[in-house]
Amino acid sequence: TGAGINTFPKTVWGFLRLLMSPEIMTLFLAMLSAYILALCLKAPPLVALIAGATFGLGSINVLYLSAGHVTKVKAISMMPGVLAGVIYAFRSNMWGGAAITAFFLSMHIHANHLQMTYYLLYLIAAVGICELVAAQLKGQIKSFTITSALLIGSALVALSPSFPGLKMTKDYSHYTTRGETVIQNSERTEGLDTDYILEYSFAKAEWLSAIVP
């Protein structure tokens, strides 16, 4: 999505930036997203509120923002909302769940951080497997199939506005430090420098701070 192309997720992000700073807006959306997920998991409103605040204000989000990983935090902030939509579609209302999924997934994809999208697919697959087993035990495979098809459709709708940007990312990825190698040396066994890869990662004793606001 170029500067002159207005899409739904781009318009939403742009509108929210008028209301608050980008960093605060991203953390707010992370809290809202996790709050909705907690509600879809039948948590009491107060518990859902605490869960949302804890997720949004987690140390890892603040660390990533301060390190300049803005698109990563934007992508992470939408992930609970996507899972909420999938769960709501299977357990309550498939149309409502599909709408929630399409909204949050379009916002997530617009962030254009494919590493986080890759992780999100694993989470969705885990939820899907659990729901498939539950549907099998309840004899509701037909309902599961219809809901799954609807969610796939909502994913395609969410993908369409950001497809040009994703295509551009794919084209230019070959010219980055993480793209294809331009040096043919069979003796080289190392990739990126370890310090470069783990510069902003937690040490072994720090991982608990990821869930402490």
Regions found by a protein language model. Give the residues of each.
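Short hydrophobic helices that act as membrane-entry/anchoring signals
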Residues: 14, 135, 209-212
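Aromatic-residue-lined binding/catalytic grooves and analogous aromatic/hydrophobic interfacial grooves
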Residues: 143
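Membrane-embedded helix bundles of polyisoprenyl
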Residues: 25-41, 45-134, 147, 151-169
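Generic amphipathic alpha-helical segments used as scaffolds and interaction surfaces in large
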Residues: 12, 25, 116, 120, ...
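Juxtamembrane segments of multi-pass membrane glycosylation machinery
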Residues: 1-22
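Generic detection of long, well-ordered alpha-helical segments
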Residues: 15, 27-28, 146, 197-201
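Membrane-helix interface linkers and caps
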Residues: 138-140
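Periplasmic/ER-lumenal interhelical loops and adjacent helix-loop junctions
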Residues: 1-3, 163-213
